[in-house]
């Protein structure tokens, strides 16, 4: 087991993930979301739960910094509370920080300002304190495949037996949080396609989405998206 995964297990993220799966499963599920519920039921399997931590969360928690350019470090070992701003209000992103709604939220910042770090902190706190199952994706790595297809691949990689219909059911259930990092890093020819998919996922399914981007990109000026700086 690599040191980052060992640290994640040590601080209790595995147990937190189990609790959030149980919390989501215990909600009142409408009949049309049966396929989505099946995905959550499978997440409670010990092997699949372990893979969610090792193959998904652990990967997202590994970071490189200026002082550690050749080795991965754990988010918690380097994180100092950062602040985001909106409408004259300063909001500190620290322990127990949550954004829980059905909106598209975009965190804007310069290169090196901490956007990706903040998004990873939101991922961590969502597992520890939230009521939705979070999935983290780096947009530059999935732009060719798209968000929904990439999410399906992540879920299938965990060993979950599912299909597109069940995934759509899960997305529409209100129990998923999508964390999409680096809109500005998408190739210019793919940006409008990815932005359209982000908007469609939110409008069709009501799924909560949090993105990051440098200023001046298409997502920063799109209507009905909440921007933080």
Specify the residue positions occupied by each region the protein language model found.
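P-loop NTPase signaling cores
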Residues: 2-44, 48-229
């Amino acid at each position: 087991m690599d040191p980052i995964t060992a640290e994640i297990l040590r601080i209790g993220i595995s147990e937190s993930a189990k609790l959030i799966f149980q919390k989501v499963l215990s909600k009142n599920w409408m009949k049309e979301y049966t396929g989505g519920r099946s995905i959550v039921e499978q997440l409670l399997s010990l092997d699949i739960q372990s893979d969610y931590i090792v193959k998904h969360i652990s990967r997202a928690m590994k970071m490189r910094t200026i002082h550690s350019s050749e080795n991965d470090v754990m988010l918690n070992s380097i994180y100092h509370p950062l602040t985001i701003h909106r409408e004259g209000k300063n909001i500190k992103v620290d322990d127990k920080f949550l954004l829980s709604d059905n909106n598209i939220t975009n965190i804007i910042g310069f290169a090196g300002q901490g956007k990706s770090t903040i998004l990873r902190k939101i991922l961590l706190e969502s597992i520890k304190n939230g009521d939705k199952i979070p999935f983290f994706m780096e947009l530059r790595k999935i732009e060719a495949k798209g968000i929904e297809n990439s999410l399906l691949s992540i879920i299938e990689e965990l060993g979950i037996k599912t299909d597109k219909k069940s995934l759509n059911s899960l997305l529409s259930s209100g129990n998923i949080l999508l964390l999409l990092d680096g809109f500005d890093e998408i190739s210019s020819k793919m940006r409008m396609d990815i932005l359209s998919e982000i908007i469609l996922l939110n409008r069709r399914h009501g799924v909560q989405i949090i993105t990051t981007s440098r200023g001046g990109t298409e997502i920063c000026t799109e209507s009905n998206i909440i921007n933080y700086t």
